[in-house]
């Protein structure tokens, strides 16, 4: 799966429009960087298994109140779980 595929899935789940695609893709890249630095393998990041956490992250950032931006605990917990799973081929 490519970043464009992931972006399209996140946009669909959140009910956003194509107009916001570039912004959403920037948020997704930020989430991917976070996941990668947390030890999640690229094979998991670029799979269906990361769509849920990516949706959570984009939703957190999309709906922030100025000065109170936080990523959700659920996103953080899911990233931790995925980091322990190793490559898709090993699961």
Could you describe each region identified by the protein language model?
Residues 1-91:
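Divalent metal-cofactor coordination and adjacent catalytic microenvironments
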């Amino acid at each position: 799966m490519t970043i464009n595929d992931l972006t399209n899935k996140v946009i669909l789940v959140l009910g956003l429009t194509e107009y916001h695609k570039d912004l959403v893709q920037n948020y997704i890249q930020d989430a991917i960087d976070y996941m990668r630095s947390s030890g999640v393998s690229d094979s998991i990041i670029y799979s269906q298994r990361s769509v849920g956490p990516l949706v959570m992250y984009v939703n957190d950032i999309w709906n922030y109140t100025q000065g109170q931006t936080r990523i959700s605990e659920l996103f953080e917990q899911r990233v931790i779980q995925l980091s322990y799973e190793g490559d898709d081929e090993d699961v």
